[in-house]
């Protein structure tokens, strides 16, 4: 299945149903009074996280989703039916962004979590609502308000504890294959990894963590070189970044310069991401003796001014890999996941039409009651005042 981590869709909540102007008509009751019912509220649009999904491919071609409109009110004080909501399933880790305002509406980080992204229109009021001691035959009603409409950008960001960084062919996919059951493609050419992949690393019977592998970065990735930096967003929720460095690049480049390239591209993408805990892990030490590897790493760290701890491993032979995994697990246990971006609960969303009818009724001035025409029918709109026109 093709991996799709971004999709722009159009969502439209349902419009509110209109109120009804009607009067009670019964034998021997010439002036039965108003009995026009309210309309129904428009349907809402929700996103719901589903752990069985891992891509946004369902929204690659199907781009428009609309909730049902509320029904109009009817005579005999009948209220219109509320429009049906629609719930759009998305993978866990999806972020919803208003494409016009760039406002983040919320993140869905748990299975079953639901988020309101477009609220339906408010129902119109029937003429029964306007009756009073001085207006016993009101011919006023309100129209339902339009539902909210958005161009919604869906961004899928993988939920992983550990993120892998490095140039192409640094050995990231080989490392994933060595520590987990994941089997990303491994080959002797750059950009073998084209899309992010996840692997679950089981340290012991009761402890495990998730590691994310993304396509390699090259110099100029921030300007679109290579595969660009679009996949770096998948590292935003990681607790620690593992910077895998080829200790003996086949092209003869300086590993210290390669580290600096990744640091620069990371900073250009996001200063916050560049400040995440980052460990240097030197790979492919099996290509030289232990003494030569230690000497080369010492030179690299001196050039970088690196004063933190570092690791020397061989992902191909799994040399020194288990101790690294145990240290990662200890770090994860000691540093619980930070709270995700504040979620927008449906009850906290303030819709623009929320106080519309209260304001209309509070400011409406009723005229003195006048005799009304017995020949008036529901089909006759003459004399009807529309409080709101969309």
Curated annotation (Swiss-Prot):
Keywords: Cytoplasm, GTP-binding, Hydrolase, Magnesium, Metal-binding, Nucleotide-binding. One of its GO terms (cellular component) is cytoplasm. One of its GO terms (biological process) is ribosome biogenesis. CDD domains: Obg. Residues 1-159 form the Obg domain. An essential GTPase which binds GTP, GDP and possibly (p)ppGpp with moderate affinity, with high nucleotide exchange rates and a fairly low GTP hydrolysis rate. Plays a role in control of the cell cycle, stress response, ribosome biogenesis and in those bacteria that undergo differentiation, in morphogenesis control. NCBIfam families: Obg_CgtA, PRK12297.1, PRK12299.1. Monomer. This is GTPase Obg. It comes from Haemophilus influenzae (strain 86-028NP). The gene is obg.
């Amino acid at each position: 299945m093709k991996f799709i981590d971004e999709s722009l869709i159009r969502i439209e909540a349902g419009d509110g149903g209109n109120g009804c102007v009607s009067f009670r008509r019964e034998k021997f009751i010439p002036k039965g009074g108003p009995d026009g019912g309210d309309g129904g509220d428009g349907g809402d649009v929700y996103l719901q996280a589903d752990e069985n999904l891992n891509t946004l491919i369902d929204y690659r071609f199907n781009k428009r989703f609309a909730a049902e409109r509320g029904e109009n009110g009817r005579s005999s004080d009948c209220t219109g039916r509320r429009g049906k909501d629609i719930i759009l399933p998305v993978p866990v880790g999806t972020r919803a962004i208003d494409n016009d305002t760039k406002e983040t509406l919320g993140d869905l980080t748990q299975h079953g979590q639901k988020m309101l992204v477009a609220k339906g229109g408010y129902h119109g009021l029937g003429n029964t609502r306007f009756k009073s001691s001085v207006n016993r035959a009101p011919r006023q009603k309100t129209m339902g308000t339009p539902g909210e409409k958005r161009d919604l950008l869906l961004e899928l960001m993988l939920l992983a504890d550990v993120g892998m960084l490095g140039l192409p062919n640094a050995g990231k996919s080989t490392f994933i294959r060595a520590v987990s059951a994941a089997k990303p493609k491994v080959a002797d050419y750059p950009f073998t990894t084209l899309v992010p992949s996840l692997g679950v690393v089981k340290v012991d019977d009761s402890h495990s963590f998730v590691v994310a592998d993304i396509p390699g970065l090259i110099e100029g990735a921030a300007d679109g070189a290579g595969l660009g930096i679009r996949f770096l967003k998948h590292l935003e929720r990681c607790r620690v970044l593992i910077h895998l460095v080829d200790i003996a690049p086949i092209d003869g480049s300086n590993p210290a310069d390669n580290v600096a390239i990744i640091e620069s591209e990371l900073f250009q993408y996001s200063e916050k991401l560049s400040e995440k805990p980052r460990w240097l892990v030197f790979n492919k030490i099996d290509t030289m003796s232990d003494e030569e590897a230690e000497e080369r790493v010492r030179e690299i760290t001196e050039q970088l001014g690196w004063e933190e701890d570092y690791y020397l491993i061989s992902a191909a032979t799994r040399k020194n890999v288990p101790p690294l995994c145990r240290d990662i697990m200890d770090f994860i246990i000691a540093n619980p996941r930070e709270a995700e971006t504040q979620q927008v609960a449906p009850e906290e969303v303030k819709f623009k039409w929320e106080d519309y009818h209260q304001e209309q009724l509070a400011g409406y001035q009723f005229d003195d009651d006048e005799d009304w025409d017995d020949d008036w029918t529901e089909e006759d709109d003459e004399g009807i005042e529309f409080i709101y026109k969309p």
